[in-house]
Amino acid sequence: MKRIFFPMALLVLAILACEQAGTSTPPRTDPPPTPAPDRLAAIPPDAVKITPETDVYPVKSETDEYADPVPLPFPVNTTGAEDSAFMMPNGKTLYVWFTPSPGIPVEKQLFDGVTGIYAFQKTETGWSDPQRIWLQDPGKAALDGCEFVLGNTMWFCSAREGYTGMHWFTAEFMNGTWQGWKDANFNPAYEVGELHITADGKELYFHSPRAGGLGEYDLWVSQNVDGVWQEPVNLVSLNSTFNDGWPYVTQDGSELWFTRTVGAPELWRSKKVNGEWTAPQKMFAPFAGEASLDPEGNVYFTHHFYTDNVMLEADIYVAVKK
């Protein structure tokens, strides 16, 4: 799970926003050009690729339902840091957040030209080269992530020029590109963190540190009534005194996957029975988080590589359903 919105990035953007205080960026109709980003050249030359064989804390399946996870091949994974995988329901398009190195200061990520969201297409022989997803006007600063797609709408979180702090935005897929980005206008009192909206558009699941929870982050759900998200309800049956967040709900609404941090991040799953979420079960650990599933039930997620409490790299892994 990425941590891209640090105080330094917000400070930089707050300075940029001073001249535009009280304003917001109107939606674009003319998308910016999308030159091929040279993300590989931005990776530090001394970066060393970590493999399952050299991983100090290899991630394992905790059940017989899934095989042990394995990393996706290049070009999805590199010696840089890949995070926040989101698989489209067709099982063919994979969105991934990339930065050249987890050690790069966030204020440099903001302006490096390559940190951001990329899309890969699954082919018969592997994965396509990445397509950079541009969600800001040329020449304006933004640090985008947390991508979630439903239909032709993308929700993404962003710290960007013209705004104070982090906000949720939406963009529409039109004429082969993402454009028309605008503020998502969630009720600020809800404190919406990373989110997932059910396939029918009726429920918004998200994590938040808002009052009334059990841990630092708790899972919450809000109902959509006539286009308005209602007061969130705490998912008491799923939450713990640990960090619980980064929800993902399967297309049929029968499973809710989330990340629980118990020393290190772990992936947990709850099944819905008779309309209620059952006690969650640990599925993958350690350093496993932010799940997304394809139509076959295979799980894509982020695995971080640590040594002596220092994060060296991050990759996207997949666990195949048996």
Give the label of every model feature segment.
Residues 15-17:
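C-terminal motif of bacterial Sec signal peptides marking the signal peptidase cleavage site
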Residues 1-4:
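Positively charged n-region of N-terminal signal peptides that target proteins for export
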Residues 19-21:
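Bacterial signal peptide processing site
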Residues 24-32:
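Ser/Thr/Pro/Gly-rich low-complexity linker/stalk segments immediately outside membranes or between
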Residues 31-322:
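Short, conserved micro-motifs composed of acidic
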